[in-house]
Amino acid sequence: MKRGIACFLKTRFRGNRLQTMLVLGVWLLSILACSQGYVSDYDLTATALFPAGGSGGGAAEPEATALPSLQPAGGGLDNPVAVGTPGEARFTPSQPIFTPLPTRSTPLPPILYYTQAGDTLPAVAVRFGVLPEEITCPEAVPQTGLINAGKLLIIPNRLEQTGPAELLLPDSEIVFSPSALDFDLKGTIQQAGGYLSTYREYLADGWKSSDEVIYKVAVENSINPRLLLALVEYQAHWVYGQPRNLAEVDYPLGMINFEKKGLYKQLSWAVQQLSIGYYGWRNGILTEVQFSDGSRVRLAPGLNAGSVALQYLFSRLYPQILWNGVLGGEEGFIKLYEKMYGNPWMRAQAVEPLLPVNLTQPELILPFLPGRVWSFTGGPHSAWGPDGARAALDFAPASVETGCEISDDWATAVAAGLVVRTDTGVVVLDLDGDGYEQTGWAILYLHVASKNRVSVGTWVQQGDLIGHPSCEGGTSTGTHIHIARKYNGEWVLADGPLPFVLDGWRAVAGKNPYEGSLVKDGQVINACTCGSFETRISRLNGGN
């Protein structure tokens, strides 16, 4: 941790001491708690942990020992590459698994943690290595829902050594949020005049300029284009300069794998790592990063999802000895990011929290016509790509044929909205109708056939026709519709604090992606790609 950061944190703790003592006093009088536990005088010596951000800001846990920082010299690190193999193991996010750390023989004072936007009690418990019932608080908080930012939680201090605790980027700089709507990607590239300004790449739908490639990855994965452009510059110097070697030409993000050659595949790999970090932290299922040599680092519990996304990505690209410097060194990524775009925390103030605590899902119906029988073929799984946010569900129409055929059945609008984007297999419905899928609720449909597909600019009512199920777009072995939700650019987990509910059927995640069920009034439909009798679901009698 940088010397200036530590000083800032000490100042912040002193400035909040009075506030902390007042809050604890109110708590002792009110005896309101998440867990009705006894509070001793010992608890009043707790360690405060305040989320903070911005240049020179961060969150710290003084008892945790930060890893030694080795800052790169000379404008970056030479040959910062990760070598991948075609059969590398994938991270498969699941539900939070509570594995509390052992109680210390001599307990340390508890931590006073102030919640951040997007926090839930189960996720916070996993990050701190405790059970949810061990966390106490001076006022009631939701047991599974989103918690207001700034709420005090008193948590047993069991973590010993963790990684760097400095907040790197706000969440809105990771996802394709409203803060990126005014970003001129093409203009920025052309004004910089580097290698990217003349770069072109051939994709499945023809030749694309560099800004088209970056935007395609950004909008498909809902990852901020500012971030992707900065990563290309930091790793390969493509924005303002030229690649320095052949590896930077073919593998600009540093993942050397012959199957991931070229800008599009490199970016696609990178956004998957960002999504694993971001949504794994959000969902309370990621607590550490692992480096290529097998060493592991426990993530500091006070981090935000955006910072974890970066820590996870760079752990896949750099050895541990260089990782700290890449994250927060004077020649590190964040310094470059601020140089390119200014203070990201100032932009975040206008758009965060991305998921307000009072947010509710609008009424949604099943994505097919009344009277038709479909199958629930996929429980919560990745919204886009092989890994990431488990925000999507799959439904397949009845068919006498297996495999990939365009169905005569229709997928329908789960809610009223404006069609703002179509592509191969893709339809995106903007529910607030402002024309941007990065604001408010948006619904992604995947595997919609091009034939008879609804057009961009069409306003549809709930239940209107969207298109025919098929295998178009993405990877599919059978005809179906893949559907996922976003809010303010963030994928909304299907079985999270804002569960996916269609005609009253609530999604429940299984142990692995694609597993899970739909539940309603005591009825349970388990997902299965087999399309068996038990998976059948219809909209007869209002979705029963």
Ranges and model annotations:
Residues 406-456, 478-480:
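Zn2+-dependent peptidoglycan hydrolase active-site motif and core
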Residues 36-43, 51, 256-377, 515-544:
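Non-catalytic cell-wall polysaccharide-engagement segments
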Residues 48-64, 96-131, 151-153, 157, ...:
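Primarily a LysM-type cell-wall glycan-binding module
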Residues 115, 120-138, 150, 218, ...:
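Short alpha-helical segments in extracytoplasmic peptidoglycan/chitin-binding modules
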Residues 356-359, 363, 374-414, 445:
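Short glycine/threonine/proline-enriched tight-turn/helix- or strand-capping micro-motif at secondary-structure
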Residues 32-114, 137-140, 157-178, 355-356, ...:
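Ser/Thr-rich, Proline-interspersed low-complexity disordered segments
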Residues 168-325:
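Catalytic glycan-binding domains that act on GlcNAc-containing polysaccharides
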Residues 362-364, 405, 412, 455-461, ...:
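Acidic, glycine-rich catalytic/binding loops that coordinate metals and/or anionic ligands
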